[in-house]
């Protein structure tokens, strides 16, 4: 059975509480449960990880290459400035799909740039929690192509 990793970055543990007008009322626990269920219907095991710490995210990206076949990543605010996470993604051979709940290109100007997207297989933004499912579908297609 294929194993994939879902990584959520800083403040995503506050889903359902933080800026519900932007991120919705759903919680991280709900998102993770829904994603695991969706993955299971595709015959895939999905493990979930969330951290507010850049180094922890870098560590799990490095470790993922030997354990998982691909990563779905929401780097949160690290998207816009973490060259360290960008370099971690670039250093591994498995595909990474970047996902964002909101459309980062329609928000504050400092959110418009993603330093991580260029080293990801693709980026999905603005579809709420459904964007994570789109990322899962895209990642599975990417793995089929390989």
From Swiss-Prot:
Keywords: Amino-acid biosynthesis, Aromatic amino acid biosynthesis, Lyase. Signal peptide: none annotated. PROSITE patterns: DEHYDROQUINASE_II. The active site is at 23 (proton acceptor), 100 (proton donor). It catalyses: 3-dehydroquinate = 3-dehydroshikimate + H2O. Its EC number is 4.2.1.10. InterPro entries: DHquinase_II, DHquinase_II_CS, DHquinase_II_sf. Substrate binds at residues 74, 80, 87, 101-102, 111. It is an enzyme of class 4 (lyase). GO terms for biological process: amino acid biosynthetic process; aromatic amino acid family biosynthetic process; chorismate biosynthetic process; quinate catabolic process. Homododecamer. HAMAP family: AroQ. This is 3-dehydroquinate dehydratase. It comes from Bacillus cereus (strain ATCC 14579 / DSM 31 / CCUG 7414 / JCM 2152 / NBRC 15305 / NCIMB 9373 / NCTC 2599 / NRRL B-3711). The gene is aroQ.
